[in-house]
Regions:
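A conserved short beta-strand
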Residues: 1-7
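Conserved alpha/beta-hydrolase catalytic His-Asp/Glu region
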Residues: 7-10, 16-85
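Short, conserved loop/helix-junction motifs that constitute active-site signature segments
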Residues: 83-87, 111-113
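Conserved alpha/beta-hydrolase "acid-adjacent" motif
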Residues: 99-105
Length: 144
């Protein structure tokens, strides 16, 4: 599980903007999804900008896709109860500067799952696949 939380509430301004397919939703999510490291550049590839990559990815989404995703997160219930029923080895990867799903919430999810390990990424925000792709891959290799 990457950047998880239960419950997973979505801020009303973000949900409202996404419902109307307003670019403000992309701006908010993109800003909140990156650590201070990611917001200042931080990409190992010269000339690549993580925030612009995130923006362009969300801009390519069809209308209502982003809202549907955020709304599903916002309405997800019984996560802790369901997590206790997981019977396979599980890995929770979380980021120290995640503003979308706080690290403390990810650790709480991990504590409810039997046979669960955790990996904390730093410096990193919710967009861990763009900020720390190699660290995510290294973590995933330990579970597959």
């Amino acid at each position: 599980l990457l950047g998880t939380s239960t419950p997973m509430p979505v801020a009303d301004p973000l949900l409202t903007a996404a419902r109307g397919n307003h670019h403000d939703a992309i701006d908010m999510a993109n800003t909140w999804s990156h650590s201070s490291f990611g917001l200042m550049g931080g990409n190992e590839i010269p000339g690549m900008c993580m925030t612009m990559g995130g923006q362009r990815l969300l801009e390519r989404s069809k209308d209502d896709v982003f809202f549907t995703d955020l709304n599903a997160c916002n309405e997800f219930i019984n996560g802790a109860e369901l997590a206790q029923k997981i019977t396979v080895a599980t890995l929770v990867v979380f980021a120290n500067q995640d503003k979308m799903t706080a690290a403390v919430n990810a650790m709480e999810v991990a504590e409810t799952i039997p046979n669960c390990r955790t990996v904390r990424l730093q410096p990193c925000g919710h967009s861990m696949l763009s900020e720390q792709p190699n660290a995510v891959l290294d973590a995933l290799k330990t579970i597959v």
